[in-house]
Every structure is written in structure tokens, then in C-alpha cells.
Swiss-Prot record:
Record bears the keyword Transmembrane: no
Function noted in UniProt: Inhibits neddylation of cullin components of SCF-type E3 ubiquitin ligase complexes and thus regulates SCF-type complex activity. Essential for development. Function inhibits cell proliferation and cell growth.
Stated name of the protein: DCN1-like protein 4
UniProtKB keywords: Nucleus, Ubl conjugation pathway
Organism: Drosophila melanogaster
Stored InterPro entries: DCN-prot (IPR014764), DCN1-like_PONY (IPR042460), PONY_dom (IPR005176)
Localization per Swiss-Prot or TrEMBL: Nucleus
Region entry Disordered, spans: 1-35
Gene Ontology BP terms: negative regulation of protein neddylation; protein neddylation
GO CC list: nucleus; ubiquitin ligase complex
């Protein structure tokens, strides 16, 4: 999942993939941790809440012992061998019921990892394929897609800013929706600075039901104006290509 924004006291610098903010990196060695809870843990060992919480504390700081923040998140991702932007991290956040991108609370951590029977990095690595497989179920994917909207947008904003929306759409639909490249191009040149939840949910429905040639799109249907404009724009682009090809 795209990296979370730091809280107000943290610094933000550079640009992350898809044009989103990326915070300045902090050395992992500067993060106080407890002695590793991963020593001598075998995969066949039963789940231990105590061990799970000790693992959580490896990624927190004395200032915020009940919150795993961006620095801890990077270390956690490193330990389980995935990039923070990997979609499996979004699925994990969904399982935890996490409310803010880039952060896990102690309660969220315990809820999700108890359900997954994970109390160590080694056990989490084994669960990654299962978490990815959840995306193969259409209903589960829809739930995760809807969850991603509130999870990724700024909590004090009603809508998701367009940069975050494009990054999340790339993550969720980029590999599976044939028209995604054209839709991303449409957003680039459009007037839209944000996407509301109704638009967000309808983009998924559009990607699942409308054919590549747009022949089954009903302009009088109950689609958001944004998608009407996308269809009009794409048809114009295609007609221009056809005209250019025909005259050459």
C-alpha cells in the first residue's frame, strides 16, 4: 500500500511513487526496540498473545508505545520481506481494521494477528500467500477496495485527493483493468482534484461491467458524471486515432 503520511510533528520530503508525499527516512538503529521476540520461535509453536505483543513492541518507541508508526512500519515490512507499497500490506491492514495508513495501533495489531495466528515474522511470511489469495474472491476484493478509500484518505477530508486516488487505483486495479492506463491518463488531464466515495465505488463497478470497446455503456445510466466524461473523452481519443490512421 502507498506509504502513510507522517503525523503533523513529522517531516515530509521528496516525492514517492505516483506523486505522493514520502517522508524523510530515519535510520532503524535510532528506533529503540526490545530484545527480539523472534529467537527460538518455531512455526509449529502455538499462538502466544504475550509473544505477539513483544513482537509489536519491537517496532514502537518509548514515546508512543501503543502505536506502530512509519519508521516501525518500514522495519516490519523489511522483516517480512515485502515493500510497504505491496498490496498485501493493504490486505493486512484490512484484516487488522486499521484506520490510518502507515500506522497500526496495539489493539489493531492484536486483533488482526490473533485472527491470523501470527506472533512472529516467520509466521507472517508463511501467511502472505493466504493474504494475497483473499483478493481473488470478488466479494472480498470489493470489501477491501471500499475499505481502502477511508483508510487512505486524510481523516480530516471528506474526499480523497487525486494523487492518493491515482496511487490507490494503480495498486488495486492497475494490473487487472484493461482500461486503467486510459483512465489514469484521463485523470491527468481532467479538472478533478479529488474523488468522492460514490465515484470511487463506481469506478470499481465500471471496471467490472463495462467492456473495453465501451459498447455496453449507457450514457443515461446511473453513473457519476466523472465516468460519463471519461467515456466521452476515450471515444474522442479513439476516433482521432482512427481518423489519423485512415488518412495516412
Amino acid at each position: 500500500m502507498p506509504r502513510g503520511k507522517r503525523r503533523a510533528a513529522d517531516t515530509i520530503s521528496d516525492n514517492m511513487d505516483h506523486g505522493q508525499p514520502k517522508r524523510a527516512r530515519t535510520s532503524y538503529t535510532s528506533i529503540p526496540t526490545q530484545q527480539s521476540s523472534r529467537r527460538h520461535i518455531r512455526l509449529e509453536d502455538g499462538f502466544s498473545q504475550k509473544r505477539c505483543m513483544a513482537w509489536f513492541q519491537e517496532y514502537t518507541t518509548p514515546d508512543e508505545p501503543e502505536t506502530l508508526g512509519p519508521d516501525g512500519m518500514e522495519k516490519f515490512c523489511e522483516d517480512i520481506g515485502v515493500e510497504p507499497e505491496n498490496i498485501v500490506m493493504l490486505v493486512l491492514a484490512y484484516k487488522m481494521g486499521a484506520t490510518q495508513m502507515g500506522f497500526f495501533s496495539q489493539q489493531e495489531w492484536l486483533k488482526g494477528l490473533t485472527e491470523l495466528d501470527c506472533d512472529s515474522a516467520a509466521k507472517m511470511v508463511v501467511k502472505l500467500d493466504y493474504l494475497r489469495s483473499i483478493l481473488n474472491d470478488p466479494n472480498s476484493f470489493k470489501s477491501i477496495y471500499r475499505y481502502a478509500y477511508d483508510f487512505a484518505k486524510d481523516s480530516d477530508q471528506r474526499c480523497m485527493d487525486i494523487l492518493t486516488a491515482k496511487a490507490m487505483l494503480q495498486l488495486l486495479l492497475g494490473k487487472h483493468w484493461p482500461l486503467y492506463p486510459q483512465f489514469a491518463q484521463f485523470l491527468e488531464q481532467s479538472k478533478y482534484k479529488a474523488i468522492n466515495k460514490d465515484q470511487w465505488c463506481n469506478i470499481l463497478e465500471f471496471s467490472r461491467t463495462i467492456s473495453i470497446d465501451l459498447s455496453n455503456y449507457d450514457i443515461d445510466g446511473a453513473w457519476p458524471v466523472m465516468l460519463d466524461e471519461f467515456v466521452e473523452w476515450l471515444r474522442l481519443q479513439r476516433s482521432q486515432v482512427t481518423s489519423t490512421t485512415g488518412s495516412s
